Each structure stands twice: as structure tokens, then as C-alpha cells.
Amino acid sequence: MKKSLVVSAVTALTIIAGLVTVGQAQKDKPVIYVSSAQATFKPTSMSGVSMAALWGDMDKGPHATFTKFDPGYDAGMHVHTSDVWIVVVKGAYLYKDEAGEKRVGPGDFLRVPGGHKHWSGGDKTEGALFYEEGSGKFDSIPAK
């Protein structure tokens, strides 16, 4: 009887400690709001692409950006090491893989799994503005 009471007390304290830790971690994460119209876009090493960091560090791990493709931008065939999630805000993100082509427009969502070979680009007249989230460090590795 005493043993089960002690086990119950230890379990309860462990749960409470865990909840306090999670609560503290959540408290330290601020709400983030960034308007795509007010975001600070910076050119990237990929000509025709600019990005505005929203959270995380795209050079080190999970991150999110607003990304712009200039009109007619062509990324060529490539892969990303990590999963990428995209929601188009303006223009059209053009996507192609072995299954076919997609014109991803405003309000549309696209998930590209890490290691999946694909082509992407911007609409010839409007380009593309999209929210992009990555599960790890950003990379774009050319593929044949």
C-alpha cells in the first residue's frame, strides 16, 4: 500500500514538473506577426530569388520565410534535404515533377518531401510570393 502511494506521488510530481517545463517553454516563445507587404526581403545566392526571414535560421535548421521568385524565375531540377511547405500569397509558383505540372496559386498549399526531385519557378508575368517553411536547414541541390 505504501509503495503504491509513493509511486503515485512520484508520478504526480513528475507530471507536474513536466507541465511546468512545457508551460515555461511556451511562455518564452513570442507571437510572431509579419506582413508580407512590410517584410524586409534580401537577395539570395540564387539570382531571381529574395527572402524575408520570419523565424528560425535557414542556414542552421527549421525556419520560415516569405520568398519571392522574379517573373520567369527558373530554379531548374533540384532536391531539398528537408521537407518544404509552401503557401502562395501572390502570383503563381510553378511546380513540376515526374507526376506532372502544377500551377500553385494564391491560397494553395504544396508540400515537397525532402529528397524529392522537382522543378520550380515563377509565373512569367507575376513571379511568385509565397510563405515557405522548412523542417531543417535550407538547401537546393541541383538534380538531373
Where are these regions (language model features)?
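Ligand-binding loop in jelly-roll beta-barrel domains
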Residues: G114-F138
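Short acidic-glycine-tyrosine-enriched beta hairpin
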Residues: M58-D59, E98-H116
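A short, N-terminal "cap"/entry segment at the start of jelly-roll beta-barrel domains
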Residues: A17-G61, K144
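Bacterial N-terminal signal peptides that target proteins for export
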Residues: M1-V10
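Conserved hydrophobic/aromatic beta-strand scaffold that supports enzyme active sites
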Residues: M51-A53, A64-F66, W85, E101, ...
